[in-house]
UniProtKB/Swiss-Prot annotation:
Gene: topA
Domain Topo IA-type catalytic: start-end pairs: 156-601
GO cellular component, one term: chromosome
Residue intervals of the Toprim domain: 6-137
Function statement: Releases the supercoiling and torsional tension of DNA, which is introduced during the DNA replication and transcription, by transiently cleaving and rejoining one strand of the DNA duplex. Introduces a single-strand break via transesterification at a target site in duplex DNA. The scissile phosphodiester is attacked by the catalytic tyrosine of the enzyme, resulting in the formation of a DNA-(5'-phosphotyrosyl)-enzyme intermediate and the expulsion of a 3'-OH DNA strand. The free DNA strand then undergoes passage around the unbroken strand, thus removing DNA supercoils.
Reactions catalysed: ATP-independent breakage of single-stranded DNA, followed by passage and rejoining
UniProt-recorded name of the protein: DNA topoisomerase 1
Length: 719
């Protein structure tokens, strides 16, 4: 009888097990850690500020929240995965019997740290860790998995050190600032990155409040044939005669007063003569780079109208694997990356697909693929580039081929990624521009003919691309010295717009541009400022700071200007990269930071004065102390000034409501549960109900109920 060796493959997500298993032989067993297995203690710093040695703890299972119904508790327990202790016990038991242990956690620094934690725990439990091998793959395909197993490596200790340094820095700043701000202004948290995001939102709000619009006028002509003319140059004699003092000539002329524009209008005749037709110029429009995490987030927010957390969730599903024709298949590569790089081998596969599907004329040139803009070069200096851009694993699996085999959300996001990837390897679109120049009493105008000569990548990307501003004129209609009559001469008023509030897409763009945050943290950053009531979404889209957010941003900016700023965060990311490369010592860096930070922290404890707003004539019914206004996570409230000795809170007039969660449906914007609500105005439902997002008022998604629909209630609890 032949003894077969046994092997263990350790991954993070249990959702990957079925997808990976089909590429392995029967002697492999897959064990999922379900994310991190150890972390710093939840309620203490977790290390001293002398040697910074972390005190790791096994992550404890979360307890059900207070007020959750017995039914919901039972369902929670029934659906719960194994706790971390059970996972570790199972892993240790299997590892002791295994001949080889492959640590296949995610291919980034956090994944490297999880592998190290597994390695360290196994070592503590007496497992022979010489059996451990670190492997990585950026996509779950047969080729990638088998290639990774064939090329194992050691755990990158410097990567682990960099990740643990980030964790300790965030703990230092988060714990110390959060404790201070909680005691002074009742703000729940003040993390390093979330505070920068809040600073961006607050500064933008200040610019909006200070904004003073500037007005200007343009003189626009519409000929009887519908051709639109733009004023390009005013007769010099007329300009001198009328005494224009402020004129700005760009592509056209802007008048600073309506009176100036009116004076020029009065000196125009009805006839506009063509005096020149320019030689046609060709202009190319190139496809954008393949997606990285930030650009996928921005595009899906803008084009699919999704929230950031939903994008992260659906992308993870496509990466871990979906069931298609009874087979588990991963559709995209690792979705957390700051790289736009793809391998030449993969690129050739896509180029061949383009040639076969659309024709050789649609294949991108090599010079086009090798080209880099100045912006790209500047941005790449901030990129870790640990793995490739987000792309379909098999480009031949078209969106249409899986449309009816995966969920509508999965299809929408896969189509977005697939289209962007294929478009990148397609030829540029080519436009032809011709300027037709007119003259009227020595005042010069022009019209533009802008037509698409070759669609190139727009053949597949038009649905997602910004609309082309094409102006198609019949060039045969125009000839030198031919005159045209005006239908209308319009004086149009314009005004500058205030800076736009951040959306989730533009906030991600701003954070990335400044080198703040990582691909794995964008959605969390955007979500936490809403959850903490530091900002709200206006019209479900635009970030606006709340009163609490403004107070927090003000105190942080006033007392921690050297910490809560983009330069510190950028420099910190650079140092973390250097630690990952082994050129900077982590403890020395942490010690230097703590020496400076602790000094500023002590000053802030003295400088920040806790403001209390007493309510005249109102006393606590329990202890007779005066009532005060306070700011909480869910907004302002009235409570006892003798807190925490007395915990009286004045109840609002709103009565407790029963929350009924709808079975089997989620919010299309943020993926939260939907709740049955009662409309104020009568609709066609007899009981006047509709579905609304449980994340209201942060998310205002609603969905109507059919009159005859009687859905099963999932959960019911009183709040």
């Amino acid at each position: 009888m032949t003894n077969h060796s046994s092997k263990i493959l350790v991954i993070e997500s249990p959702n990957k097990v079925k997808t990976i298993k089909k590429y392995l032989t029967d002697d492999y067993e897959i064990v999922a850690t379900v994310g991190h297995i150890r972390d710093l203690p939840k309620y203490t710093l977790g290390f001293n500020t002398e040697d910074f040695v972390p005190k790791w703890e096994i992550i404890q299972e979360k307890k059900p929240a207070k007020g959750v119904s017995a039914t919901k508790k039972a369902k929670t327990v029934k659906k719960a995965v194994k706790n971390k202790k059970e996972i570790i016990d199972e892993l240790v038991d299997k590892a002791k019997k295994a001949d080889e242990i492959y640590l296949a956690t995610d291919p980034d620094r956090e994944g490297e740290a999880i592998s190290w934690h597994v390695y360290d725990v196994l070592k503590e439990k007496g497992v022979n860790v010489n059996k451990c091998k670190r492997i990585i793959f950026n996509e779950i395909s047969e080729k990638a998995v088998k290639n990774a197993i064939a090329n194992p490596r050691e755990i990158q200790k410097d990567w682990v050190s960099s990740q643990i340094t980030r964790r300790r820095l965030d703990r230092l700043i988060g714990f110390k600032l959060s404790s201070l701000m909680k005691s002074k202004i009742n703000a729940d948290s003040a993390g390093r990155v979330q505070s920068i995001a809040l600073k961006f939102i607050t500064e933008r709000e200040e610019l909006i409040n200070k904004f003073v619009p500037r007005f200007w006028w343009t003189l626009d002509v519409i000929l009887k044939d519908g051709t639109e003319l733009m004023l390009r140059k005013i007769d010099e004699k007329l300009k001198d005669k009328l005494g224009f003092k402020e004129l700005e000539e760009v592509s056209g002329i802007d008048f600073n007063t309506k009176e100036d524009a009116e004076l020029v209008k009065q000196h125009l005749s009805d006839k506009y003569r063509v005096y020149a037709i320019d030689t046609p110029k060709l202009k190319s429009s190139y496809p954008k780079e393949v997606y990285k995490t930030s650009t996928l987030q921005q595009d899906a927010i803008n084009k699919l109208k999704w929230r950031s957390m939903k994008i992260t969730s659906v992308a993870q599903e496509l990466y871990e694997g979906v069931t298609i024709d009874d087979e588990q298949i991963a559709l995209i590569s690792y979705p957390r990356t700051d790289s736009t790089r793809l391998s030449p081998e993969y690129g050739k596969t896509v180029l061949d697909f383009v040639a076969k599907t659309y024709g050789k004329d649609y294949v991108a040139t090599q010079s086009q693929l090798n080209g880099e803009t100045k912006a790209n070069k500047k941005q790449k200096a901030k990129v870790q580039d640990a793995h490739e851009a987000i792309h379909p694993i098999d480009i031949s699996i078209t969106p249409d081929s899986v449309k009816n085999k995966i969920s509508s959300d999965q299809y929408s996001l896969y189509k977005l990624i697939w289209t962007r990837t294929v478009a990148h390897y397609m030829a540029a679109a080519v436009y032809e521009l011709v300027n037709i120049r007119f003259i009227n009493n020595n005042n010069k105008f022009y019209a533009v003919n802008n037509t698409l000569k070759f669609d190139g990548y727009k053949k597949i990307y038009t649905h997602y691309d910004d609309k082309d501003h094409l102006r198609k004129l019949d060039l045969n209609h125009f000839a030198i010295d031919k005159e045209f009559e005006a239908k209308d001469v319009l004086l149009n008023e314009h005004q500058t717009k205030p800076p736009a509030r951040f959306t989730q897409a533009t906030l991600i763009e701003a954070l990335e541009t400044e080198g703040i945050g990582r691909p794995s943290t964008y959605s969390t950053i955007l979500d936490i400022v809403l959850k903490r009531n530091y900002a709200e979404l206006v019209n479900g889209r635009y970030y606006k700071t709340t009163d609490l957010g403004q107070k927090l941003a003000f105190e942080l900016d006033k007392n921690f200007p050297t910490i809560i700023n983009k330069e510190f965060t950028k420099n910190m990311e650079t140092t973390l990269d250097e630690i990952a490369q082994g050129t900077v010592n982590d403890v020395s860096y942490l010690q230097a930071f703590w020496n400076d930070f602790s000094e500023v922290l002590n000053e802030a404890k003295t400088n920040i004065v806790k403001k209390v707003e007493y309510i005249e004539g109102k006393n606590c019914p329990n202890c007779s102390s005066q009532l005060v206004r306070r700011e909480g996570r869910y907004g302002p409230f009235v409570g006892c000034s003798n807190f925490p000795k007395c915990k009286f809170i004045e109840k609002s007039e709103q009565k407790a409501k029963e929350i009924v969660y709808e079975e089997g449906v989620k919010c299309e914007l943020c993926h939260a549960k939907l709740i049955r609500r009662v409309a104020k105005k009568k609709g066609r439902n007899k009981d006047n109900t509709f579905l609304g997002c449980s994340n209201f008022p942060k998310c205002k998604y609603t969905k109507s109920l059919e009159p005859e629909k009687d859905e099963t209630i999932r959960d019911s609890t009183i709040i």
